[in-house]
Amino acid sequence: MAHGPRYKLAFRRRREGKTDYRARYKMVETGKSRLVVRITTYHVIAQIINVGMNGDETLVSAHSKQLQKMGWLGGTSNTAAAYLTGYLCGKRALKEGIEEAVLDIGLRPAIRGSKVFAALKGAVDAGLNVPHGESVLPDESRIRGEHIMEYAESLDEEELRKRFSKYLERGLSPVDLPEHFDEIKKRIDEEV
């Protein structure tokens, strides 16, 4: 560690790898709400947050665990779940009267077609106005899980049971994932 009078210590949250203050300042400067997307190992979280004098205020929130309560049988951290979580958050935001937001991906790298941008596409498809470039969004077939379906079809029966044991435990064949995705999206439209 550096010593001496010229050494400058970074902010605690920056040292902990939690906050990029330069990016946060630019987002706060816009005066718009933030669409905050966080991907954990097992879940996806999407929130609409406003900056306040006494700290940030969460206006709307959606968690991929809530998809299971709506009947989602797939994984809660895959691209399809990220899209549906963003879609659910976008629908709830519109219901609360929030029409515009700025994407906040935190310290995650902006990788084309990633889960973060799948959640963004979900929020945009729900009707939320979020500035973005079309080139970063994943394609529709990937969001619906068609790549998983194709992979599952290429496996033999024993290998399929081994690789997709959790899906089969829950009563969902990976071959039926795109239809199941459409069904849950329709259910979100009806319930929210």
UniProtKB/Swiss-Prot annotation:
GO terms for biological process: ribosomal large subunit assembly; translation. The keyword Ribonucleoprotein applies. One of its GO terms (molecular function) is structural constituent of ribosome. Keywords: Ribonucleoprotein, Ribosomal protein, RNA-binding, rRNA-binding. It holds the Pfam family Ribosomal_L5e. One of its GO terms (cellular component) is cytosolic large ribosomal subunit. Transmembrane segments: none annotated. Part of the 50S ribosomal subunit. Contacts the 5S and 23S rRNAs. Belongs to the universal ribosomal protein uL18 family. PANTHER family: LARGE RIBOSOMAL SUBUNIT PROTEIN UL18, RIBOSOMAL PROTEIN L5-RELATED. This is one of the proteins that bind and probably mediate the attachment of the 5S RNA into the large ribosomal subunit, where it forms part of the central protuberance. This is Large ribosomal subunit protein uL18. The gene is rpl18.
